[in-house]
Amino acid sequence: MNLIMGYTYLIPILFASYLIGSIPFSWILVKVFYKRDLRSVGSGNIGATNAFRVNRGISFLVLLLDIFKSVLVILILEKMCAHKSIMYLTGFTVVLGHIFPVWFLFKGGKGIAPTIGVVLSINIKIFFLFIITWAVVFMIFRYSSLSSIISIISSCIYCAVTENFNSSIFYIAMSIIVLIKHRDNVIRMINGTEKKLF
């Protein structure tokens, strides 16, 4: 286990995780099935929520695929008997790839789906907290962005309380970046110009 997860092996694993995270499933599917560039649709964001504005079925498939990016990487690490903190670090790298894909000059999605994949794979309690919080907030306000923001904050607090420092620090860092990516949504909500999903 120590040999496999040594620094010599960790660097290429993190690099591969970044590349997997950077696969733009939303852009690919919308381009293939609808001949449209998702960057010119709605918010211009390359993510499941913006894909929803093209087709609901496509957005659901995008969501599953983006979640699966993190799940795949972490399941492989689990088979390699990696420490939980390494799983969080690698999941963090997948999320970074999703948010900052090299293929689109580091302008990607907002990281919610791969973050869900991380907690689904590592801590099922955080996953359920995230999903339930998102659903409740969305039913009340109908803003996907607000639901995501509150879910990230609540799951981040729970992770900080229940996980050890080495594990929680990576999830907290990941959460901060995801929240920063939602800053424009926060401004639009304050100004009353944020669009409800439906």
UniProtKB/Swiss-Prot annotation:
Q: Which GO terms describe its cellular component?
A: plasma membrane
Transmembrane portions of the chain: 10-30, 57-77, 86-106, 118-138, 160-180
Per the record, the GO terms for biological process are:
phospholipid biosynthetic process
Membrane topology type: Multi-pass membrane protein
**Coiled-coil regions listed in the entry:** none
What pathway does this protein act in?
A: Lipid metabolism; phospholipid metabolism
**Cellular localization per UniProt:** Cell inner membrane
Q: Entry's Pfam families?
A: G3P_acyltransf (PF02660)
GO molecular function of the protein, one example? acyl-phosphate glycerol-3-phosphate acyltransferase activity
Reaction catalyzed: an acyl phosphate + sn-glycerol 3-phosphate = a 1-acyl-sn-glycero-3-phosphate + phosphate
Sorted alphabetically, the keyword list is: Cell inner membrane, Cell membrane, Lipid biosynthesis, Lipid metabolism, Membrane, Phospholipid biosynthesis, Phospholipid metabolism, Transferase, Transmembrane, Transmembrane helix
Q: Which domain of life is it from?
A: Bacteria
As recorded in UniProt, its EC number(s) are 2.3.1.275
Q: What is its main location?
A: membrane
Entry's family note: Belongs to the PlsY family.
What function does the entry list?
Answer: Catalyzes the transfer of an acyl group from acyl-phosphate (acyl-PO(4)) to glycerol-3-phosphate (G3P) to form lysophosphatidic acid (LPA). This enzyme utilizes acyl-phosphate as fatty acyl donor, but not acyl-CoA or acyl-ACP.
The UniProt subunit note reads as follows: Probably interacts with PlsX.
Q: What is this protein called?
A: Glycerol-3-phosphate acyltransferase
